[in-house]
């Protein structure tokens, strides 16, 4: 990890996060990667592929370095997920990670690395749709992995929000998060407001979630910036055009 650097983030991301924290120091920051560096992956590509088992330990150290580097900038990473949407290998970037692979990574590499470095950042598993409650349950059914895990995270592009209750019933001592749902450029304001309040805000809380996140916070009128192949119609809570900010439906959902 001799080339590890946050230099790309110091221009925009880190200054914005510091401004947010200055306005509200109680804000919690969660990190969820789309992909490891491509040299750690089976296909040496930003799209899809798996994390090579021989790189599990170095990727765990990558998380450690990231959390420590952000802390040096005054930003505490409250929680991380090992992988955003680990069953979605078509995005650019993305990574496919099975429940067995995530279990191995957490119990044998990430958890021990955090422990050795004295890092208290929470580890949250799954971070994908409500159609697969079996995925986080499989991880939590492994006692060695469970010892390092704070909870499970969900999205609702597939499945039913009651999946959170299934995980709660299997492991009531672990937290539940709802970490992503987007509103689209072609959707109606009233339709999105009704659906998100019913499912994302009320529905998740009635199914044991302590967190409900809208995605994303802000973008420009062309729904950028985004990665090549990234979402071209995901609307921010606010649209930024020059010095003007327009509030969108996610602003009112939040």
Segments predicted by a language model, with ranges:
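Short, conserved phosphate-binding/catalytic loop or strand-edge motifs used
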Residues: 82-88
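Feature marks short, surface-exposed loop/turn motifs that line or immediately flank catalytic pockets
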Residues: 37-38, 86, 185
């Amino acid at each position: 990890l001799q080339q590890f650097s946050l230099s790309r983030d110091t221009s925009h991301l880190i200054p914005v996060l510091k401004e947010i924290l200055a306005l509200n120091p109680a804000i919690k920051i969660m990190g969820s990667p789309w992909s490891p560096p491509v040299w750690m992956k089976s296909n040496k590509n930003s799209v899809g592929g798996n994390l090579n088992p021989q790189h599990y330990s170095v990727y765990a150290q990558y998380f450690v370095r990231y959390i420590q580097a952000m802390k040096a900038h005054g930003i505490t990473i409250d929680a991380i997920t090992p992988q955003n949407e680990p069953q979605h290998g078509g995005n650019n970037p993305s990574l496919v990670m099975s429940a067995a692979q995530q279990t191995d990574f957490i119990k044998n590499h990430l958890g021990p690395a955090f422990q050795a470095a004295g890092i208290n950042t929470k580890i949250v598993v799954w971070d994908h749709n409500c159609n697969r409650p079996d995925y986080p349950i499989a991880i939590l059914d492994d006692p060695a992995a469970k010892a390092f895990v704070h909870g499970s995270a969900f999205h609702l592009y597939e499945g039913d929000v009651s999946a959170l209750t299934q995980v709660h019933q299997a492991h009531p001592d672990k937290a539940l998060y709802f970490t992503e749902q987007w509103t689209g450029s072609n959707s109606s304001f009233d339709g999105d407001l009704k659906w998100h309040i019913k499912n994302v805000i009320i529905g998740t809380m009635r199914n044991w979630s302590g967190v409900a996140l809208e995605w994303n916070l802000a973008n420009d009128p062309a729904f950028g910036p985004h990665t090549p192949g990234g979402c071209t119609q995901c609307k921010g809570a606010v649209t930024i055009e020059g010095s003007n900010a327009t509030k969108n439906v996610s602003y009112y959902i939040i």
